[in-house]
Structures are given as structure tokens and as C-alpha cells.
Amino acid sequence: MNQHATTARLAFALAAALAMPLAAAPAPRSATPRYDAASHVFRLDAGKVTYAMGVDEDGRLQTLYWGARLAGDDPLGPAMPARERSSFDPKGALSRQEYAGWGGNITAMPALKVKFDDGNRDLVLRYDSYTIDHGALAIVLRDKQAGVDVTLRYTADEATGIIGRSARIENKGKQPLTIDSAAAATWSLPAGSDYSLRYLTGTWAGEWHLQTRAITPGATVLESRRGSTSDENNPWFAINRGGAWDEASGDVWFGALAWSGSWRIRVDEDILGQVRVTGGFNPFDFGYRLKPGEALETPVFYGGYTGGGMGEASRLLHRFEKTAILPHGDEAKLRPVLYNSWEATEFKVDDAGQQRLAEKAAALGVERFVVDDGWFGARNNDHAGLGDWTVNRTKFPNGLKPLIDKVHGLKMSFGLWVEPEMVNPDSDLYRAHPDWVLNFPDRQRSEGRNQLVLNLAREDVKAHLFEVLDKLLTENDIQFLKWDYNRNWSEPGWPQMAPDEQQKVYVAYTHNLYDILRRLREKHPGVEIESCSGGGARVDLGVMALTDEVWPSDNTDASDRLSIQDGFTQAYTPAAMMAWVTGSPSGMNQRPTTLDFRFLSAMQGGLGIGANLLDWTATDDATAKRYVAEYKTIRATVQRGDLYRLLSPQGRAPWSATNSVSADRRQAVLFAFQRQAEEARAFPTLRLQGLDPAARYRVRYIHGSAVPGTPDAASGAYWMQHGIDLALKGDFDAAGVVFEKR
């Protein structure tokens, strides 16, 4: 085959793929931007937020304001360049630019850095024009001499005030260029001091640790270089002003990047005390080549503001995710109660055994039955078979149909585990196509979990994966896929491309992943998908736009999950957060907990069961059946309501408590947990939030009780101001309380 012709076809296909939108999601309810020609100021007013920017005398587009909503006639602008401080910091060098190129006298962190084939690395972006179309503002910045246009796109969600920003970088010159780094946006906070940063870190089985640090002169870098989102850092941040963090009050600016590949968010404070947050593609090993006429579009970087503290910042993000990010928006189905058979069987799955588990699950009230790893290919352990997505006829002699029919007959939907992006070297797929994995020719291929990463940037690999998944869904009546991803990248080569084009793999891979998910959803609209990556290593607003739920962690220990879920909900909605009840003692840490504690912990998200049901006693079955029935009466409130975090479990704190309130405020659900009893310290009084103060709420206990003298009914004001004292005693005690408006 002609190598040059092959490379040309691959380049054409890649260019077409990168021209597509990043992810399909419900359209946000956008506020209409405004432009004042006299002051040269652009303004977005949405929710309780105003965002404004203006063009200064030298053509720089500068941030003017981001904060609480202002009156429509309040003056903003004109923009002024930063004054000269010395010859080391000349005029304009530290201006609050919306999207700065690296060029001229700029010393602040640029949003875009490029180099040209003639050796030039100077890029000075100046305002050119704007358009407003269907609630979206597009501003064109241009370096006419270099032949580079950058189109900045802004949307503002009317309900939450959350702003979406992205950039399209186009080579309009006559020579190729290479993008060294490309951000989606730079957010400039109001001038001031005493800012503090929050972010999320973790590792496998220990995701979602909430970190806090003061912002001081210099830089803090949050990133993934791993090819995917990762659990090391998550592409989310929150910044407050005033030092102390509070759930209920205080200024908080926050943001999240909609990208499932390698990413970076950098927080800078410059010598003037100006705080900036710049985020987008990770520039590490980036080197993205643009020929004349080619363009690159960044992911969307969302940002918001509230004066209502960290709790309200989370609730705004949750509402935005539910209405504008997750598929189906307000019309999305509630997460069904799920059973997954992995803990019961691991790789030893077969038709008869799965049917027995299905019968047990259905008797508990489970609504979805999922067969995990081991149903396909020569898959008897994690050493072989991955990539061969055909039913193992030894385990399922008549295919999946008998099991699927059994599950449907038990009034449950049916799901399967898949890991399409990976392959075992010991597989038919790899033996046929060893060139399909990420690799550098003649170099060792590093394995993780005995598997390699397929190069989804290749159009033939993308086509193959869509074909086999489409065939699986077409031939079997499947309603759910648990889409896993169990390792990071290594040797990220793309030998089929020209050497100067190979680093496009980071962007093209993620675009093609999105395209597969999008096309599967379009062709099989009844199939729901969960994003899983050995737990929570692929959770971001990009993949969430194309999946219905996410798996926060492989750690299902009920006590550890309190901290995991607390960290997760800082940024992401419980509507997408799956949580399982598994065995005791925990396989993760050998900690024993009661079935009551395990159910109440898992009921704070989408409830699942992953224990070996064949080991449960009749008493266990009865307990589980009761909790499943109780959960169905409150899940709309838990999944679609507003979440209030009352007691934080972070840092191995002894207590945890949350309450959720339905949109109409007719129901509230309180969960309280005591990990460790402490001598002479009673469980704290819990004062609920979000209730209707004038309404009366009757109390019903799912589990646990209040101290003697607690009323059966009282006003919302009473429960929020006086509170409730729960009778929690001993280690790993818990309570679940429902408040119903009378």
C-alpha cells in the first residue's frame, strides 16, 4: 500500500473528525449577550451573575468583571491596559486578557502558544469582530501578520449563570504552524487578595480527596498527562475569597473542563496580585500541527460564581449538569436500582449461575441486572480475550438470549460490561491487528492489567469498535453498557501518520471516543451507558454529556464511600453517581459494617447492589428488600433534588451528614453516619437546609431514631433552626430520615 496515500487519507479523516462538536448535550438555556459600542464592552447577564469584557485602546480583549449580577445600566468599562510598573513590566504586559497569545511583551500565562516553520514564535492577538447568534457570542481575535484567527465562543446558562467558553484556532496564513499549548479560556478573578483554592485528587480506590490551599504568588498546576481524565486530579476547581470555606456563605468562583483526554488547569497569581485560571489541552507532548486552512477547536471550559458558599456552588453545577450536560436534560430517567454480578462470580460467569443471581436480585426489587467481565472471548482471567467481543459459547452455549429473556421475564432490564478501548495481546483481535495499539515502532509495548490501549485516533480502529458494539446491541436486547477503561496510556505513538502529525493522537483519540458514543446513542436510543475507569478515573463534563451515569470508585467500602461521595459531589451531581452495597467485611480493607450502614451510604446516589446474593441469609434478603422499596420512594429527591452537605467526612472525620430536598420542597431526605463513637461527644445536632420554612413536615424514619421528645411533625423553620438530634450510638451507626410536607 502507498504509505503517502494512506497518510493523506488518515489526515483528511482526522481533519473531518476534529471539525465536529465535542459532545452532544441538551442545549443550555442561554441568556442573550449584549454589546455596547460606545464603551466597546461585551456583557453577559445570567442567573445571579454578570460577566463583562472590553476592548482596550491597543485592541486587547480584557476581563472587566465576573461576579454578582449588576443592574442593567451599571457602567462597566472602558477597558484599560495594565499600567507600566517598570521596564521589566511594561504597559499592557499584565493586562487581564481574555485569551492572550504568547507574543509581544506579555509576561502573564498565555492561553495560546504557537511556532511557525520560519522560526517565528511571536503571536499578538487583537480584537477584530464579533457576532451574536442564538444566544452565543463569538469574538474573533486576530494576528493578521501571522495569519492566525482565534474565535472565542461564549454561552451563559440563564438558570445558573454558568458560562461556557471555548476557542477555535485557525491557520489562515501561508505556512504551517505548530500549537505548543492551547487553552479553552483564561478566567481572571476580581482584584484582591486572600484567595483560596480547592481541587480534587486521588488514586485508584482512593479518589475524590478534597484539597485546600492558599493562593499565593506563583502557580498551582492541576493536570492529567495520562491520556484520559485520570483520578490523580480532576478537571474542576473552586476559589473563595476571605480564607475560611463555608457551605452556606461566601464568594466562590468555580469551573470545570469538558474534556476526557490529557488536560491542564493552571492557577496563577502574578506580581500585581491578579489571580488567573487557565485551562484546556495539556501542553505536555502536545505539538499540534496546523497546515494552512486547518483549525483546532478546544473543549469547553465552564465557569460560575456564587455568593452562597461552597454548597451553592455545587448545587449550581449539579443543576447545570442535570439540565444542560447529561443526556435528555430534565427528561432524563431516574437511575434504576441495579445489580452487578462481578463480586459474586468474577470471571466465572455462566448462563445457569447468572440466571440464579437474576432470580435473587429480582426478588429484592432490583430493576437492572448487569453481567460484568468474563462473558466474551477466551476470557477466564484478565490475561486473555479482551478485544474479542463475541459471546463465549462455553459459558453461554445458546448465546446471551436465554439469560436476557430470563432477566426481562423477571421485569428487569439487562446490561453488560465492556472495555472497548483495550486489548489483550492474547486475543484474536491483537493477533490480527498488532499495529492497532498505541506504539512506537521497534519499542517495547508496556502492559497494564495485561492489556494494551487501542489507538482510537485511527479511523479503522474507530470503525471496528463501532461495528462490533453496534452488532452486539443489534443482535441482543441490551439496555445498558458499563463502559470500562482500566489503564493509562503508554508509548503514545501513531506510526501511520507523518512524524509531525503524530502528536494529534491526544486530541483525535478523544474526539473519536466521543463520536463512537454519540453514534451508538443515536442508533440505539434505548441503551444507557455508564462511564467507568477502574472507578472514577474518567469523570468530566465531556464524557458525562454522552453517558447516563458514572462510577466514582472501585472502592465500595461503605465508610470510605462517605468521603468519596462527598468529594465527588463538590463538582458532580448525585443524579449520575452510582453507589453499591457490597459484602462485609469489605474486600477493599476488611472493614465490617452492618447491612443498614451499607445501604444508607449507597442510597445517597444511584443505588446498586454488588454483593454475592447467594451468600445472603433470609434476614439479609428481607433487609435489602425493605431498603430497595424505601429507596424508590425517595430516589427522585436524592437524584434530582438539591443536595446540602451538613457534616463533612473529609479527613477521616467521625461523622457525616447530608440532606436532599425535592424541587417542589415537598420531601427532604436526611442521611447521618457515625463512623466512630467518641467518649462524651454526642452526635451533633443536625439543622436541615432548603425546606419551606412555612410548611409543616412529618418525620418518617427509614432507619434509626431521634432522641426522646423529638416531635413527629414541625415546621420547616423548626427543622432548619432548631434541628434534630439523632440517637446514633457506637461505631458505624447510621440513620435515614424522610421529611414529608403535610
Regions found by a protein language model. Give the residues of each.
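Glycine-rich, aromatic-flanked loop segments that form ligand/cofactor-binding clefts
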Residues: 103-123, 242-262, 304-329, 366-373, ...
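C-terminal beta-sandwich/jelly-roll accessory domains of carbohydrate-active enzymes
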Residues: 676-742
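Aromatic-lined carbohydrate-binding/catalytic grooves of carbohydrate-active enzymes
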Residues: 330-467, 480
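Polysaccharide-binding surfaces and accessory modules of carbohydrate-active proteins
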Residues: 28-35, 39-43, 51-52, 61-268, ...
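Active-site neighborhood of glycoside hydrolase catalytic domains
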Residues: 397-399, 431-433, 437-596, 606, ...
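Short Pro-Gly-centered flexible turn/kink motifs
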Residues: 112-114, 122-127, 288-307, 732-739
